A protein has these predicted regions:
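A conserved regulatory-domain signal marking ACT and ACT-like small-molecule sensing domains
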Residues: 1-160
């Protein structure tokens, strides 16, 4: 078995630390609720590093990642938002690679890992990156590092 390529400086060196904390916020499907959520985070100095919004008839599910999960969590609690948390991985997309998403999906397919959902990062020090929620984060990170990808850690998020 080949040795794992260590993550770049700043990227998390342990696979568990390489996961990012994602907040899954349930919003009523009403005008202004998203603005209220973003304003609450802004008032405590939290920048949104990644966001995905799924709408249904009565509610919206907002998935987001901020630079400081502890501060973000407390903000959501204080503002009365209903939310849950999950761990995801973020993978840097090399600028010199014409088809990084194809390489990522093929690498994970080779280990029979399912990607449940994905969305882009808005703010990341290393450049373009994608958030992945997969069956096994540790195995996915190991495989992607072997294939030359960088796993984004908390220190790679844009500052608060």
């Amino acid at each position: 078995m080949q040795d794992l390529k260590p993550p770049e400086a700043g990227a998390a060196s342990g696979f568990e630390r390489a996961t990012l904390r994602q907040f899954n916020i349930f919003l009523e499907n009403r005008v202004g609720r998203l603005a209220a959520l973003l304003h609450a985070l802004e008032t405590v100095g939290q920048h949104v590093n990644a966001v995905s919004i799924e709408e249904s008839a009565d509610a919206a599910l907002v998935r987001l990642i901020c630079a400081n999960p502890k501060t973000g969590r407390q903000c959501l609690l204080d503002a009365g938002f209903s939310f849950s948390e999950s761990d995801v991985i973020a993978v840097g997309l090399p600028k010199q690679d014409d088809h990084p998403l194809i390489r990522i999906t093929r690498a994970l397919l080779s280990a029979e890992l399912n990607i449940h959902y994905a969305f882009p990062m808005l703010r990341c020090k290393i450049g373009p990156a994608i958030i992945l929620y997969v069956d096994d984060r540790t195995l996915a990170a190991q495989i992607l590092i072997r294939k030359g990808f960088t796993i984004v850690g908390e220190s790679d998020l844009m500052p608060e």
